[in-house]
């Protein structure tokens, strides 16, 4: 059993408790590897089986195979009746199932000999009380942007100040940061009775009880939000905030021997390929898929496109020919590769042939683009993605047409609009240079002595010394 860390010099044992979805699991895995390999910590990662998606299961298996120093703690959920929330998103349902099972974590943590915890924002309000009962400091790894963290921290105050107004959620002007327009607020938060809204508000109110908050960003990408959070401008009594990003992919995980996309990229000229992917979390309508296909074809550029047509990958049985217009694959076969297979996104973005990333702006995708110096054409669809797209535009990492529709709004983004934006971004040398400068800043941040490296070292030191607050 790993020993708890203390001031006598024993290695601290940090237990990481992620929630569901690749957007949450991936940064937790990267944090686990960073702490265990470079910051003198024993690390365990709590896993819940079965996972919601096949991608999650494969990711966890690869992580534990490649990094045996990261211990696996399997956690069995209490029975949960999903019929209480008819039609709810399967990942929100898993959040709720994990939240209701949180009291069962106590024996697992006792048996593991934990000295500190870091959990996901989706579980904050239910894991902090468990940690307190165990006498353990509980940090939060916030897997989205610092801008989104500031919204999460301030949103309960905003609701309290506007209670009884009857006007619903409008623009949210976050102290020390900037105004998040109504149109960029995650869709679910406009419904006070939505399952996600209840979770989001409860977790936001609990942030001040955390020992500290790690956020996967770096100063040059989000200077206003990071500074405001660290200076306590967003919410009173806020804990220390550690900007530890970009959390880098583990370098020795096995590659898929059957994948052919890297061979295809190797055959393309430098800075000629548009990489298109909308992540693992949400599907795009068939109508929008076909407009996107026509837009890519009309742009005249080479492209690698990863297509997803269902929320959960296990349900995705449709063939590419069913999803796209007849003849499309044949027309573009000499300059486009379209796949439904998993790709190593970080490997793709680092490839010299890739010049532009058409992205939903999930936060992992944004940080990977920044670390790789690849400009982004933002096409947000859901959740925090418009907030993240705003970060991309503010930082100069990419461009975003903020009038484009997203999930729940009428209309689709037309092929001609997409084509013109792709052509403009591919021709924008200033955009390319700014993205390259952000990659340099990201590399400096995570290198020894850099701001993110220092923050992660300080977090490990606090856990080692047992000085994290446990309020």
Swiss-Prot record:
Active-site residues (renumbered): 24 (proton acceptor), 120 (charge relay)
Which enzyme class?
Answer: transferase
N-terminal signal peptide: none
Chain segments carrying region UDP: 280-281
* One function term, GO molecular function aspect: 2-hydroxyflavanone C-glucosyltransferase activity
Presence of keyword Transferase: yes
List ligand-binding residues for UDP-alpha-D-glucose.
143, 343, 345, 360, 363-365, 368, 384-385
Q: Which reaction does it catalyse?
A: a 3'-hydro-2'-hydroxy-beta-oxodihydrochalcone + UDP-alpha-D-glucose = a 3'-(beta-D-glucopyranosyl)-2'-hydroxy-beta-oxodihydrochalcone + UDP + H(+)
The positions annotated for binding an anthocyanidin are: 24, 383
What EC number(s) does its UniProt record assign?
2.4.1.360
Does Transferase count among this protein's keywords? yes
Entry keywords, A to Z: Glycosyltransferase, Transferase
The record's section on InterPro entries has: UDP-glycosyltransf_plant, UDP_glucos_trans, UDP_glycos_trans_CS
User: What Gene3D superfamilies does the database record attribute to this sequence?
Assistant: Glycogen Phosphorylase B
Concerning its family, UniProt says:
Belongs to the UDP-glycosyltransferase family.
Role description: UDP-glucose-dependent glucosyltransferase catalyzing the c-glucosylation of 2-hydroxyflavanones. Acts preferentially on the dibenzoylmethane tautomers formed in equilibrium with 2-hydroxyflavanones. No activity with naringenin or naringenin chalcone.
Q: PANTHER family attached here?
A: GLYCOSYLTRANSFERASE, UDP-GLYCOSYLTRANSFERASE 708D1-LIKE
Official protein name in the record: UDP-glycosyltransferase CGT
Query: What organism does this protein naturally occur in?
Result: Oryza sativa subsp. indica (Rice)
